[in-house]
Amino acid sequence: MRDQFISLALILCVLHSACGLYFHISETERKCFIEEVPDETTVIVNYKVELYDPRSNGFMPSSPGIGMHVEVRDSDDKIVLSRVYSSQGRISFTSHTPGEHVICMFSNSTAWFSGAQLRVHLDIQVGEHAIDYANVAQKEKLTELQLRIRQLLDQVEQITKEQNYQRYREERFRHTSESTNSRVLWWSLAQTIVLVCMGFWQMRHLKSFFEAKKLV
């Protein structure tokens, strides 16, 4: 059971660090994805747009006039990246604040292609998964051993960033819990005070009523 849990955790880590998928959108539609990213972490987004061809009843490489507008916002809702790219490309950005980063994509629709159906292939890579080590080895002339050491160092650095991010999330959750508990406590005290005041007022009112009726 423990081995199965560890395997599941490793699979989830891999899926979190590298995500490959495709989705269908119309040219007027906007699709957004949320990626939790530690601070100072590189994120690479590879995408390819295909256009639906009714004659072949399939998706073909998109026309030159179709591109993708990509917008990235950090956890503070600040725009990290916003520009128009071609129908196929590679986007890279580095996070400067930890938390959820929203990646939104929509086509630069034109009157000619408006309403067409698109299929977008998307691959999001985070951390050391975003590094092309073959290119690094060729550029820096690293041996196989040096490259392996470089990979291990990058993995350790990424694990440290992930741990720091988890501590940040725990601290934020604890702060939220403490704030919520404090509000619940004050609300309970306020309710108690209101009930006591209402009870006191009802007793005074009943006493005045009985005295007016000369029952006491």
Swiss-Prot record:
Signal sequence annotation: 1-20
Motif (Prevents secretion from ER) on chain: 213-216
Cytoplasmic face residues: 204-216
One family name in Pfam for this protein: EMP24_GP25L
Topology Lumenal: residue spans: 21-182
Keywords carried by this UniProt record: Coiled coil, Developmental protein, Endoplasmic reticulum, Membrane, Signal, Transmembrane, Transmembrane helix
Membrane topology of this protein: Single-pass type I membrane protein
GO biological process, one term: dorsal/ventral pattern formation
A GO CC annotation given for this chain: endoplasmic reticulum membrane
Transmembrane helix in keyword set: yes
Positions in coiled-coil regions: 134-164
Chief location of this protein within or outside the cell: endoplasmic reticulum
Spans traversing the lipid bilayer: 183-203
Residue ranges occupied by any GOLD domain in the UniProt entry: 30-126
SMART domains assigned to the protein according to its UniProt record, in alphabetical order: EMP24_GP25L
Compartments, as annotated in UniProt: Endoplasmic reticulum membrane
Family listed: Belongs to the EMP24/GP25L family.
Role description: Eca and bai are essential, though not redundant, for dorsoventral patterning of the embryo. Specifically required during early embryogenesis for the activity of maternal tkv, while the zygotic tkv is not affected. Involved in Golgi organization.
Protein name: Transmembrane emp24 domain-containing protein eca
Lineage: Eukaryota, Metazoa, Ecdysozoa, Arthropoda, Hexapoda
Gene behind this protein: eca
